[in-house]
Amino acid sequence: MSAHDVRLFGDAIAASRLEDRFAKVKASSLLRLAIEDLYPGRIALVSSFGADSVVLLHMVAQVDPTTPVVFVDTGQHFDETLRYRDELVARLGLTNLVMAEPDRETVAEEDPEKFLFASDPDRCCDIRKVQPLARALGGYDAWITGRKSFQTATRSRVPLFEAEGDRVKVNPLVGWSATDLIDYIRAAGLPPHPLVAKGFPSIGCLPCTSRVAPGEDPRAGRWRGRTKSECGIHTEPLNVGQDI
């Protein structure tokens, strides 16, 4: 079965067939396949420009620097992340940065003081991250994520290809270890996120991200003290108007 034999409409059968066919393909080759062969003009990389985002950004830039790179500007990012984003876009020659932003009226109504994260973090993530991304991905058949199986228990069984409603998520780094990421960044001479050296192995919005102690789960600093471990973009199919 070749890539062209599969009808890529995001159904579970298509994702399963792709998984079986390309499970042994290395990450860089998988990205080239997805961008140039499987979903030409219909795929985007979603990047947080976080702790190890530079790996996928570098790989995508080598395949096609015009590939859409979607960044969700929640309005709550660290300043370091925003500067790092601009640095990487320029350095890697990425030419299609897509900004996904929260609906201003919704934010003004539900979070005018920017403290919704403290009382209802799920709703805060929904209006600031989930819904903006759902709108931004409306015209794509597939999107690329940077999830890795070592990050949390909820990500330990993430496949390479994952059905999401009428789209497919491609997870090329799912089998990578933390050492693999570090080695790639060093070998390619890429700049690390400035907060990594300060104890932030996983970086999200400023109010809900804290330092991680040695030996802790890499995402232990996200929503610390709560049972929440995901923002919502990977827990349900992305649909505008969904209630997480």
Question: What does each model-found stretch correspond to?
Answer:
Residues S2-I244:
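Nucleotide-activated chemistry modules centered on ATP-dependent adenylation/adenylyltransferase
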